[in-house]
């Protein structure tokens, strides 16, 4: 009995121990000084009865990344270069909290990578060959990735299998790059001031490590240029006269004072960030710990312990000394979105040959939404002679995110998504120009013809004679998808203006609005794919998705009203669609609801519509605009409406089902005539309307992009 009691006591104690471990955030320290500070943090949090934190020590950021991925630790603060590494397989970590810099009045979650030199010299950024260089550390953002990416054209490096470190070792006469292999690349460690095993170490045991160390390397006269961040000079030199002895090298091969960093920097890069596991990452616990820690031990909060401070002789332990707080990173943001396409691509390019970099720059990667679009895209890619390749995602917003990260380059979007993409920094490049219903003859000037927009309409069965715009409340509704123009933004924007209520799931009795919560009324009418899977997903796996899907929802008597565009009914009735559900449908069996309470035939949409909507448009990043335009205009000359290889080989504007990649009634992709921002393209009235509607609910991607603009 006594033995049983002891066993139970032991198991209870073990359970309490494990429960404590589950509640506690295990912080990973990358050096002994960091571990010492971490234990001080732990003791001070305990004193104020704050959230528990425990500490483990590893010898490098990569070891901490591995420990977190293996669930042996929970969090570590990383520079952007290691955020990139942490986001890769097999680790798949993501940033959960960003360090905030600046002031309380002007906080920012970015900093500037700069090249600092002593005044008096005459060399410029393009004249560094043969000089001596000081770096914060191998693979770090300001000290390695950004400057080496900037200098790559001068390095005489053709790419792998030779490591880029070899080219850098040849380029500079001597360097200090903490973390470099001093056996393989002795020149990269020649300037370092550490002794014995600590020479060139990736830790504070190397005096020239990190920002202050690299700047010290320059100040001591060891190096000619230091690659650091803009704040280092101000943090390490409080005297203005001393700061005046240094200046910045600018990308335009001029020099500027150190306080002109906004006009003279190598790159603007995201803050250091705390990373955690993408799945079961204790994000809430980590944020609660950081929030309370900054409240108790932030700037000027406590004389006993400084969260953003380091002991004399040390710098930036656990967090940057210049940080003023943390900002929680929205859950939609992974490492690629956090770093941005420019920096993300720059790091990748440091690992590719010149030929690979040039080939990627020339190629357009199209993003396909869902399996059906991907099949069509792969067919296009196979005939494009390498000009176009494909990536895919399950939703439009996921595709927009791939374009933002540089993993894809372009896609054609409905106006509602053009708004989202524009808010995230993408731009319209070409617009879908639609065939005129009045004429079937091709327009030789289609590419230069200004786009007119299309009509968003509410379609009902002609037999439902009592149904008008004024009586749609409580009926069953069919929508193209949430956030799309004709199917959501316009009708729901009108209803919001009428009712002032955001409870759209209560306005109609049941709906199919792909992209909604599958458990809500807004998905009740959706049917998914042939196997009954993928119900309410915002792609073509949901049979009631898109213009054709929403009309099918009405035609099959699931819904009472369908919100589509004016040509949708024409394209799917009177023999224009041979699919089983549509082949017997008659145009005359449907009618339009007018805003004045009247009803009219479908052919009279000009005088009975909800609003004029902007045409779909191709969007991309600014860096890809010209190449994308060149490729698409060439591709439509071959595969467009009257292309040389359509219909014999492939047609861009025809689909196995309906409206895959582009709308099937697209006549051509047309120039924008100056409407090259989302605001200009969509027009002020539409932008104002959708901005108003977003008060009801924003999307995770919009929330993420709002954060990234800070």
From Swiss-Prot:
Residues spanning the signal sequence: 1-19
UniProt region (Important for full bactericidal and antifungal activities), positions on chain: 21-22
Active-site residues annotated for this sequence: 92, 278 (nucleophile)
Gene Ontology CC terms, in alphabetical order: cell surface; cytoplasm; early endosome; extracellular exosome; extracellular region; extracellular space; nucleus; phagocytic vesicle lumen
Outcome of swapping residue 272 to A/C/G/E/F/L/M/P/Q/T/Y: Destabilizes iron binding
Domain Transferrin-like: 25-352, 364-695
GO biological process entries: antibacterial humoral response; antifungal humoral response; antimicrobial humoral immune response mediated by antimicrobial peptide; bone morphogenesis; defense response to Gram-negative bacterium; humoral immune response; innate immune response in mucosa; iron ion transport
Organism in which the protein naturally occurs: Homo sapiens
Role, per record: Transferrins are iron binding transport proteins which can bind two Fe(3+) ions in association with the binding of an anion, usually bicarbonate.
PANTHER family: LACTOTRANSFERRIN, TRANSFERRIN
Ranges for region Interaction with lipopolysaccharide: 39-49
Chain positions recorded as Fe(3+) 1 binding sites: 79, 111, 211, 272
Sequence segments annotated as region (Involved in glycosaminoglycan binding): 46-51
Transmembrane segments: none
Region listing for Interaction with PspA, in residue ranges: 39-46, 57-58
List of residues binding Fe(3+) 2: 414, 454, 547, 616
Pfam families in alphabetical order: Transferrin
UniProtKB keywords: Antibiotic, Antimicrobial, Cytoplasm, Disulfide bond, DNA-binding, Glycoprotein, Heparin-binding, Hydrolase, Immunity, Ion transport, Iron, Iron transport, Isopeptide bond, Metal-binding, Nucleus, Osteogenesis, Protease, Repeat, Secreted, Serine protease, Signal, Transcription, Transcription regulation, Transport, Ubl conjugation
Tissues in which the protein is found: High levels are found in saliva and tears, intermediate levels in serum and plasma, and low levels in urine. In kidney, detected in the distal collecting tubules in the medulla but not in the cortical region or in blood vessels. Detected in peripheral blood neutrophils (at protein level). Isoform 1 and isoform DeltaLf are expressed in breast, prostate, spleen, pancreas, kidney, small intestine, lung, skeletal muscle, uterus, thymus and fetal liver. Isoform 1 is expressed in brain, testis and peripheral blood leukocytes; isoform DeltaLf is barely detectable in these tissues.
CDD domains given in the database record: PBP2_transferrin_C, PBP2_transferrin_N
Protein name, as recorded: Lactotransferrin
Residues where hydrogencarbonate 2 binds: 480, 484, 486-487
């Amino acid at each position: 009995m006594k033995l049983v009691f002891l066993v139970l006591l032991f198991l209870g104690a073990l359970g309490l121990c494990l429960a404590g471990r589950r509640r506690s955030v295990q912080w990973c320290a990358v050096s002994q000084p960091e571990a010492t500070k971490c234990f001080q943090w732990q003791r001070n949090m305990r004193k104020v009865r704050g959230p528990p934190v425990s500490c483990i020590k590893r010898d490098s950021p990569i070891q901490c990344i591995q420990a977190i991925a293996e669930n042996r630790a929970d969090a570590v603060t990383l520079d952007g270069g290691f955020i990139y590494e942490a986001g890769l397989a097999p680790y798949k970590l993501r940033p959960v909290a960003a360090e905030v810099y600046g002031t309380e009045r002007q906080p920012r979650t970015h900093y500037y990578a700069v090249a600092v030199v002593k005044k008096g010299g005459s060399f410029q950024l393009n004249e560094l060959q043969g000089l001596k260089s000081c770096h914060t550390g191998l693979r770090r953002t300001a000290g390695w990735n950004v400057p080496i990416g900037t200098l790559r054209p001068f390095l005489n490096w053709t790419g792998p299998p030779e490591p880029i470190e070899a080219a850098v070792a040849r380029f500079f006469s001597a360097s200090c790059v903490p973390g470099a292999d001093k056996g393989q690349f002795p020149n990269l460690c020649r300037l370092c001031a550490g002794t014995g095993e600590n020479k060139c170490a990736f830790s504070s045991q190397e005096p020239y490590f990190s920002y202050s160390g690299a700047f010290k390397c320059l100040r001591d006269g060891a190096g000619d240029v230091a690659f650091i961040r803009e704040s280092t000079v101000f943090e390490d030199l409080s005297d203005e006269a001393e700061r005046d002895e240094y200046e910045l090298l600018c990308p335009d091969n001029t020099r500027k004072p150190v306080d002109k960093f906004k006009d003279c920097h190598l790159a603007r890069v995201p803050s250091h960030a705390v990373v955690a596991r993408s799945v079961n990452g204790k994000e809430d616990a980590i944020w609660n710990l950081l929030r309370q820690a900054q409240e108790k031990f932030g700037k000027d909060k406590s004389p006993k312990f400084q969260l953003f401070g380091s002991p004399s002789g040390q710098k930036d332990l656990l967090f940057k000394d210049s940080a003023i707080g943390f900002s929680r990173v929205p859950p939609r943001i992974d490492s690629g979105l956090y770093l941005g396409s420019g920096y993300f691509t720059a790091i990748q390019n440091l690992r590719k040959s010149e030929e690979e970099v040039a080939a990627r720059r020339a190629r357009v990667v199209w993003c396909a939404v869902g399996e059906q679009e991907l099949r069509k895209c792969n067919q296009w890619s196979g005939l494009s002679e390498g000009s176009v390749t494909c990536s895919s995602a399950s939703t439009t917003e996921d595709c927009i995110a791939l374009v933002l990260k540089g993993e894809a380059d372009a896609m054609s979007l409905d106006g509602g998504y053009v708004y989202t993409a524009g808010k995230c920094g993408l731009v319209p490049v070409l617009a879908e120009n639609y065939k005129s219903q009045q004429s079937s003859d091709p327009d030789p000037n289609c590419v230069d013809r200004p786009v007119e927009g299309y009509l968003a309409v509410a379609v009902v069965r002609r037999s439902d004679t009592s149904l008008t715009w004024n009586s749609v409340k409580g009926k069953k509704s069919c929508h193209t998808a949430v956030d799309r123009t004709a199917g959501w933004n316009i009708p729901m924007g009108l209803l919001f203006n009428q009712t002032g209520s955001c409870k759209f799931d209560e306005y109609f009795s049941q709906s199919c609005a792909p992209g909604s919560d599958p458990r809500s009324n807004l998905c009740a009418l959706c049917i998914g794919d042939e196997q009954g899977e993928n119900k309410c997903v915002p792609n073509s796996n949901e049979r009631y998705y898109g213009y054709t899907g929403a009309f099918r929802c009405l035609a099959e008597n699931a819904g009472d009203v369908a919100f589509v565009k004016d040509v949708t009914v024409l394209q799917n009735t009177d023999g224009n669609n041979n699919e089983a559900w549509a082949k017997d449908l008659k145009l005359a069996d449907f009618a339009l609801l007018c805003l004045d309470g009247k009803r009219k035939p479908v052919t009279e949409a000009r005088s009975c519509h909800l609003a004029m909507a902007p045409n779909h448009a191709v969007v991309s990043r600014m860096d890809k605009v010209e190449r994308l335009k060149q490729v698409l205009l060439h591709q439509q000359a071959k595969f467009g409406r009257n292309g040389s290889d359509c219909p014999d080989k492939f047609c861009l504007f025809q689909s196995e089902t309906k409206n895959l990649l582009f709308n099937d009634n697209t006549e051509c992709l047309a120039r924008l005539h100056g409407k090259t921002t989302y605001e200009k393209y969509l027009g002020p009235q539409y932008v104002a309307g959708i901005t108003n509607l977003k008060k009801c609910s924003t999307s995770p991607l919009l929330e993420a992009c709002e954060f990234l603009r800070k």
